[in-house]
Amino acid sequence: MAQYSRLEVAQVMKDTGLVPLFFNSDIEVSKKVLKACYDGGARLLEFTARGDFALEVFTALTKYAIAELPGMIMGVGSVTDAAAASLYMQMGANFIVTPVLREDIALVCNRRKVLWSPGCGSLTEIARAEELGCEIVKLFPGGIYGPDFVKAIKGPCQWTSIMPTGGVSPTKENLEGWFNAGVTCVGMGSKLIAKDNSGNYDYNKIENMTREAMQIIQDLKN
């Protein structure tokens, strides 16, 4: 069961402005990535369900976060149907992120008051997502649309909360473009969850980059 309601999760997204995301099939490695993000100040993490045994890894991460990382809100991404969403919510997912807009996922999440953020690529899709109860819309792939698309949407729909994923990097220039355009938060994957030259995760770098990105975002919000 979720530890946080959709309104609580939405508020943390608005307050912190950053949702790190990644997938790895190794539980211990994934714990270290999660800890690095947490130590860097992140209070949300989207574990993308993109590989075999993702549910097993996510369950272990959620238990670890509850026991060792107070205030860390675990969610799951790359969910493509209601059955998977229900399964992850039973394993403690506090939010569900999807690459597409699906009404069946909206229904199961709303029934449990769990935040869901569907991937949308047009104002029509965004409007439909909001009609279905979406608090924060995922703009995906963000790099295709860019800050100008967000700015255009916020003109007629000032109430819309947007989280671009894809095309976001932890640099001041990139984040400034997004937040000045009016995004609520950003999802950040490989540009933040860094690896060294040997292909292994660089946990110190992940922690430092998370901290720096959080500081940039807070400066832009204030």
Regions found by a protein language model. Name each.
Residues 1-83, 87-91, 180, 200-222:
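Conserved N-terminal beta1-alpha1 strand-loop-helix module at the mouth
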Residues 18-22, 45-47, 74-77, 96-97, ...:
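Hydrophobic faces of well-ordered beta-strands that scaffold small-molecule active sites
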Residues 34, 58, 85, 106, ...:
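Generic hydrophobic/aromatic pocket-lining and core-packing "Φ" positions
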Residues 38-43, 68, 89-96, 111-117, ...:
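Glycine-enriched alpha-helix->loop->beta-strand junction motifs that scaffold or abut catalytic
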Residues 43, 95-105, 139-146, 182-202:
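Glycine-rich phosphate-binding active-site loops on the catalytic face of alpha/beta enzymes
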Residues 49-50, 79, 100-102, 121-122, ...:
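Short, ordered loop/turn segments at secondary-structure junctions
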Residues 81-91, 124-132, 169-186:
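Catalytic cores of alpha/beta
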Residues 95, 99-145:
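Histidine/lysine/aspartate-rich catalytic loop segments that bind and position anionic ligands
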